[in-house]
Amino acid sequence: DGDIGFWFTGKMPVRSAKVDRRLPTPGTGEYDWKGDIPFDQMPQVVNPKQGFLVNWNNKPAPWFDNGDDSEWGPFWPITDIANEIKDIAPLTTSKVAHVGLHAGTRHMVASALLPLILGAAERTDADNDPKLHAALQYLRAWNLYQWQGDVASGILDTWMGLAGVNALADDFGPMMPAVSLDGDGTRGGGPKIGMIAALSVTVRALQGPQASLPLKYDYLKGKSRDEIIIGALKQAIGVLEATKGKEMSKWGRQPSWIKFDPLPPIPATARGTYIQIVEAAKPDLNGMDILPPGQSEDPQSPHYGDQRELAGYWLFKPMLYKREDLVK
């Protein structure tokens, strides 16, 4: 009938009001759970006003407080995905596939971080420094997508860790986790939750009052946000010069890989090895999927590598729903 909806399920605890979910809960009884959240109080929606639903491991609703996870923040990919979906008409499976490609190859946090750097450069005399100017030119020309040899993402990833330390180290010192993803701007290996939380706080601290959720605590201790941002960029240039040489064009991103030993690997991006795109059409379902290691993931299988090259190019194979289609 064309209806869409979702219901968030599971047994979610009603916690004691005394519990601070950021800290371990004492096991002395008075902090025990008070039952489960009723189903009608869980996030759910049917036929939302925007006409679509999207998800990328994000919170099920802004108001829902699931205290067991913190991998959210102003940079989570769901915002870019929603903005892209709303501008697609008509919405087809092939166009949805491109949304996945864009989400998987776009730098995960650049859309939140890049405006901080470029804004600080506009407000300061950073461009008077030849090295800063050259780095800023790479960042200004960047389309936020990652590719082998991409200099801008290498600069941003290095800046990210240094900016986090400069912004938060006064409070966290040796407890400060590395503010990074997994070295290439994707989540291929999965960052620690502490890294994500630190990055979220760093972004909000550097955004200041303009943050969607401004911080109440002054982690910067009155220091200039622009000074921290440009200072971290200077440091990043120094680190990259020391590790990759003076020639900035050689600071490009090196890809990581999804291995298919003994076959050659494919480039690793923010994706699963199994992806399906299904349209609930009438009279038949319409869909495509990709599963590069095969269902068995057995290197001895004759079909182990059938989909490897397709996956490397973000391509899909048709999903067959009828037995007669199998013999065509």
Where do the model's predicted regions map?
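C-terminal/peripheral segments of proteins
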Residues: D1-K328
